[in-house]
Design a protein with these regions (language model features):
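Vicinal oxygen chelate
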Residues: 3-12, 32, 42-47, 63-133
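Core segments of cupin and vicinal oxygen chelate
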Residues: 9-52
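A broad, low-specificity signal marking well-ordered, structured residues that form hydrophobic/aromatic
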Residues: 42, 53-55, 110, 120
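Flexible, active-site-proximal loop/turn residues at the rims of small-molecule/cofactor binding pockets
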Residues: 36, 79, 126
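Acetyl-CoA-dependent GNAT
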Residues: 57-62, 125-127
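Short, charged/polar, Gly/Pro-enriched secondary-structure boundary elements
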Residues: 49-53, 65, 116-120
Length: 133
């Protein structure tokens, strides 16, 4: 299956989430909608990526975010200077560094939590989709 991935998450404060992910992780707004059957939303991504985020807020029946310590979005950043810069940007944008529930992520990465408790891991390593035998 060849597909584009959308990661959709309810948030408490839509604009706060947008600013945090744009400033902290370098995303840009690629779409927005208001009062679509009671939902407001913003899509964030970057040109050329095969994924994007959608943050939503329901005006009628707000959904409280309910992430767990193992609900992770992991970004693999093999370049040390890009990794360090992104970690600094995440902190400056309001992400809070937390100890990872799974110690594996603390070996080569840092785990951050946004204002809704969603976790992002910045992993200082490369990733390959090749199948291991």
């Amino acid at each position: 299956m060849q597909a584009h991935l959308r990661i959709a998450r309810p948030v408490r404060e839509l604009e706060k989430s947008v600013k945090m992910y744009c400033k902290g992780l370098g995303f840009v707004e690629i779409g927005r909608f208001a009062d679509h059957e009671g939902f407001d939303g913003v899509m964030l991504g970057r040109p050329g990526l095969s994924y994007h985020f959608e943050f939503t807020f329901c005006r009628v029946h707000p959904v409280a975010p309910a992430p767990t310590a193992e609900d992770l979005i992991v970004f693999y950043l093999p370049d040390p200077s890009e990794w360090e810069s992104t970690c600094r940007s995440a902190l400056a944008a309001g992400f809070v560094e937390v100890k990872s529930f799974n110690p594996y992520w603390d070996r080569l990465g840092r785990t951050f939590e946004d204002h809704d408790g969603y976790r992002v891991v910045l992993q200082r390593a490369a990733w390959s989709n090749s199948v291991s035998s």
